[in-house]
UniProtKB/Swiss-Prot annotation:
It catalyses: urea + 2 H2O + H(+) = hydrogencarbonate + 2 NH4(+). Its EC number is 3.5.1.5. It is found in: Cytoplasm. The keyword Cytoplasm applies. PANTHER family: UREASE (PTHR33569:SF1). One of its GO terms (biological process) is urea catabolic process. InterPro entries: Urease_gamma, Urease_gamma/gamma-beta_su, Urease_gamma_sf, Urease_subunit. It comes from Proteus hauseri. NCBIfam families: PRK13241.1, urease_gam. GO terms for cellular component: cytoplasm. Gene3D superfamilies: Urease, gamma-like subunit. This is Urease subunit gamma. One of its GO terms (molecular function) is nickel cation binding. The keyword Cytoplasm applies.
Length: 100
């Protein structure tokens, strides 16, 4: 199977998101990379499902709460930007202060 560098990046991000999902299900608090991966995956999946950029920007702020991540993580993640493929092309989805 041949994958482009972009496809490899998406696959790696998705895998990290799955790890984060499992750790969260076990009741563990997520660290920085896990938090970013989980939020990014939720955004990419939403785009795949046909949601709008505005919907994803709103939903991206509801993926995690401060109680679900390690201390200091909400302050470290000020913005997350994810390039997603929509039916009408590729767009950049930005989420400001994603963990509240």
């Amino acid at each position: 199977m041949e994958l482009t560098p972009r496809e490899k990046d998406k696959l790696l991000l998705f895998t990290a998101g799955l790890v984060a999902e499992r750790r969260l299900a076990k009741g563990l608090k997520l660290n920085y990379p896990e938090s970013v991966a989980l939020i990014s995956c939720a955004i990419m999946e939403g785009a795949r499902e046909g949601k709008t950029v505005a919907q994803l920007m709103s939903e991206g702020r509801a993926v995690l709460t401060a109680e679900q991540v390690m201390e200091g993580i909400p302050e470290m993640i000020k913005d997350i930007q994810v390039e997603c493929t929509f039916p009408d092309g590729t767009k950049l989805v930005s989420i400001h202060d994603p963990i509240v």
